[in-house]
Design a protein with these regions (language model features):
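Blade-terminus and WD-like Trp-Asp/Gly-His loop motifs, strongest in beta-propeller folds
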Residues: 54-65, 104-127, 152-160, 164, ...
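Short, conserved, GDST-rich strand-edge loop motifs in beta-rich repeat architectures
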Residues: 67-81, 164-194, 246-264, 304-307, ...
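Asp-box/WD-like beta-propeller blade repeats and closely related beta-sheet repeat scaffolds
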Residues: 103-196, 210-226
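Loop/turn-rich, solvent-exposed surfaces of beta-rich toroidal or solenoidal domains
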Residues: 309-311, 327-369
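Blade-loop segments of beta-propeller domains
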Residues: 50-53, 71, 76-127
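Conserved blade-ending motifs and adjacent loop-strand segments that build the rim/top face
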Residues: 285-287, 327-338, 369-394
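Beta-strand-rich domains and repeat architectures in extracellular enzymes and scaffolds
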Residues: 37-82
Length: 422
């Protein structure tokens, strides 16, 4: 990591004094963030076992879920397994292998989530008997429960999950899908009636299609290509488990994009947990890319502000017309939005720049001041879009640590940083 100075402040959009010379309210100090501490090491590559923003720490904060793989510079194929392991933070970062999965990728890994309603238990996606499923595993006893739907998002209470079609995603966005045909990709149906968002009860295994792809045809970008595909991806459930945010996309000319799909159109949506009250988040042209819930009603989404420039936005569901452009100019990039547990700060990291460095900043939401907290070099072997190593940060639930993936020391490994809040 290039040391860019912890206390340097890039910009503050609000002055420290008001226009009439009176002193403004005292601002919350930025936290101290330690240098990165590697918790995995080679020769194999490692990454957190889930997408950014998802908690990887066990309830007692002793273990962290990671993925281990020999594959470096290509997508995995059907039957190629990665190892799911636990890093024991109290035993010299010992790697404990606990499961294997062939449903994984370099972006979302295997979508591991700890379940608060069962001791020593987490879930992950896998392929069993030819089908993509969720495995609920007690890693100490080895006891498993199979849910016949792969998860895309899990509620904080661990009771609900959203499932999408990862086989269709392998066609339309290969770096986020799974190989092996464990679901019907419906590749000959542009707007399927029987595919979309599935709400899954993780305790009973029951599931219901709550929003079909076809039902949103009139609200999504239209396609001229008869072989084009509409699909859903990237879902997240609100903290109180009452709302869902997701991205709906259309992609055309897949034959011409064979081997590297890079052009699609995005529409951002929210709905209630039961699929009701579907709302578009933005006007035409804004799209949507990365996102996170700040609280039960407020979202941050990187989108194309006024159809001009990608930036960070914050809005309240139901008041989308009051959307705010955060850090205009400084934060005009497509970053992974991540809120501190108290909601006062937002972390964001972007794609690598012309110097092949991934920058990482912390934003104080009170005044939109921005502080750099890192810049991480990307070696050539990790610059491919499909096998890239995004930082994909995630806070420990108590905010005392933040973890991320990085290749700045030559291989894909997992790091944590200690945080001291003031």
């Amino acid at each position: 990591m290039r040391n860019i100075g912890f206390i340097s402040l890039v910009v503050a959009f609000l002055a420290s004094c008001t226009s009439n010379g009176t002193t403004a309210p005292e601002l919350t100090p930025f936290p101290e963030v330690s240098e990165p501490i590697a918790i995995t090491q080679g020769p194999k590559d490692h990454l957190f076992a889930s997408y950014y923003g998802i908690n990887s720490w066990s309830p007692d904060n002793r273990y962290v879920t990671v993925l281990e793989t020999d594959i470096i510079d290509r997508l995995s194929e059907d039957g190629e397994y990665a190892t799911i392991g636990l890093i024991d933070l109290q035993d010299n970062n010992k790697f404990i292998p606990v499961a294997k999965t062939c449903c994984w990728n370099f972006q979302e890994a295997a979508m591991c989530h700890w379940l608060p309603w069962a001791d020593d238990t987490f879930l992950y996606n896998d392929k069993r008997e030819g089908k993509f499923v969720t495995v609920i595993l007690n890693w100490k006893t080895g006891e498993e429960k199979i849910i016949p739907y792969p998860v895309s998002a899990v509620s904080r209470d661990g009771e609900w999950a959203v499932s999408i079609n990862y086989a269709r995603l392998r066609l339309s966005r290969p770096d986020y899908g799974y190989a092996g045909g464990g679901q019907d990709a419906m590749k000959d149906v542009s707007w399927p009636e029987n595919d979309g968002l599935w709400l899954v009860n993780l305790k009973t295994g029951e599931a219901e299609l709550i929003v079909s792809i076809a039902s949103l045809k009139d609200q999504m970008t239209q396609m001229q290509d008869p072989k084009g595909l509409a699909y859903f991806c990237h879902t997240i459930i609100s903290p109180n488990a009452k709302k869902i945010f997701w991205l709906a996309r259309t992609v055309e000319n897949l034959d011409a994009q064979a081997g590297f799909v890079s052009k699609w159109q995005t529409t951002s949506f929210t709905c209630d947990l039961d699929g009701g009250n579907v709302r578009r988040c933005f006007p035409d042209g804004w799209g949507g890319s990365h996102f996170n819930w700040k609280d039960d009603q407020t979202l941050a989404v990187t989108a194309k502000w006024e159809d001009r420039v990608y930036g960070h936005t914050i809005f309240t569901v139901g008041e989308e017309d009051k959307v705010q452009h955060i850090g205009a100019g400084i934060l005009d990039f497509d970053g992974h939005c991540l809120f501190s547990p108290d909601g006062k700060f937002m972390s964001s990291d972007g794609y690598f720049n012309e110097y092949f460095e991934r920058s990482w900043v912390m934003i104080r939401l009170e005044d939109q001041a921005v502080m750099p907290i890192g810049a991480f070099y990307v070696p050539e072997i990790y610059r491919n879009t499909y096998t890239r190593c995004d930082l994909h940060p995630r806070f420990r639930p108590d905010g005392a640590q933040i973890g991320f993936n990085s290749v700045h020391e030559g291989s894909r490994q997992v790091y944590i940083r200690n945080i001291e809040w003031k």
